[in-house]
Amino acid sequence: MKFSQASLLAACLPAISARFIETAEADNVILKPDELYLIETAPGKTQWVTEDQKWELRRNGQRFMDITDTPSLGSTRLNAQTVSFPKKCVKQDEVADLSKNLEKKNMKANLEKLTSFHTRYYKSNYGLESSDWVLEKVNQIIKDAGAQDTVYAESFPHTWQQHSVIATIPGQSNSTVVIGAHQDSINLFLPSILAAPGADDDGSGTVTIMEVFRALLNSKDVVDGKAPNTIEFHWYSAEEGGLLGSQAIFQSYEQSGRDIKAMLQQDMTGYVQKTLDAGQPESVGVITDFVDPGLTTFIKTVVEEYCNIPWVETKCGYACSDHASASKAGYPSAFVIESAFEYSDPHIHTTDDNIKYLSFDHMLEHARMTLGLVYELGFYDFSDSSEDRGDL
């Protein structure tokens, strides 16, 4: 039945689009129905599709990377080093102090603003406006922390309207720890027209890492650049289009020889109801497929140390979020989601992905985990912790 409804909506697209452009000229989206895109649905498995076919695949549960502009991502890092991660947490006192700064009210206020945009579809003017707001908010956080002399945020532009946002906290080396979330949203039943509040997907991750960024800047050592490693926070554009924004960024990093030691993606951090309805304990879902096993193991340790709820292993398939872009570029990456994948939010990609379904207490647990991870790894000495994959 879902497929029939989607097909009917797709058939009505030309007429509806014309009406939409007439009544909402402020958000014109130029449709190119015949343009082809190269997608990868599994490692090495590619096909050419139209944009409508991309959305049909997504409606039917198929994830993919759109590699039209990034066909060689990772090709120069095939013999990259394998990174070793800590065996235990050692920064408990510092993280405990910083965690006191995490505030649910900030996440709620930021999410209310983020969901006020009609959509955050990456090809729309709304998507541009929402990314402008993300950059503005991140810069305000830096200013409020008095960190402007060392910490900075900038736009990473793309060939579509919405830009990505990168905040950088320089450390004593160029070795970098990345925390990511995607800022765009989509309504898979008519992306250029219908509302897509995207509260959980991925407004929740966006504001979770935004709050972690704010809390982290309460550390004078971090702001003063005393951490051994550089720390970056990424808010990606166009994840819903096939991980487009994150691929562009990690392709740029690969080409410039950036030393990324770890990347954690936070995509959907707020929904717990299906878990509770199934009689399962509230937990965070640690993804175990298509991720770096060493980083993933350490994340479990971080959850046990800094969260009030346990972790549960789960899988989400190929290219299920932006960590896949980092992984393909040859960088260690991991993904933590709100629950076991089968209990994740059923409202996403529709007009009903709203704040009312989310738990800010649960989002706070994700924030605690993320803060613990970024502080532990930010102050970790990676210099003696790598081995060449070619020797394995």
Curated annotation (Swiss-Prot):
Binds 2 Zn(2+) ions per subunit. Glycans are attached at N174. One of its GO terms (biological process) is proteolysis. Residues 1-18 form the signal peptide. It is an enzyme of class 3 (hydrolase). Keywords: Aminopeptidase, Disulfide bond, Glycoprotein, Hydrolase, Metal-binding, Protease, Secreted, Signal, Zinc, Zymogen. CDD domains: M28_AAP. Disulfide bonds join C316-C320. GO terms for cellular component: extracellular region. It is found in: Secreted. Its main location: secreted. Residues 19-82 form a propeptide. It comes from the Eukaryota. Zn(2+) 2 binds at D201, E240, H349. GO terms for molecular function: aminopeptidase activity; metal ion binding; metalloexopeptidase activity. InterPro entries: EF_Hand_1_Ca_BS, M28_fam, Peptidase_M28. The keyword Metal-binding applies. Its EC number is 3.4.11.-. The keyword Glycosyltransferase does not apply. Its cofactor is Zn(2+). Zn(2+) 1 binds at H182, D201, D267. Belongs to the peptidase M28 family. M28E subfamily. Extracellular aminopeptidase that allows assimilation of proteinaceous substrates. Monomer. This is Leucine aminopeptidase 1. It comes from Fusarium vanettenii (strain ATCC MYA-4622 / CBS 123669 / FGSC 9596 / NRRL 45880 / 77-13-4). The gene is LAP1.
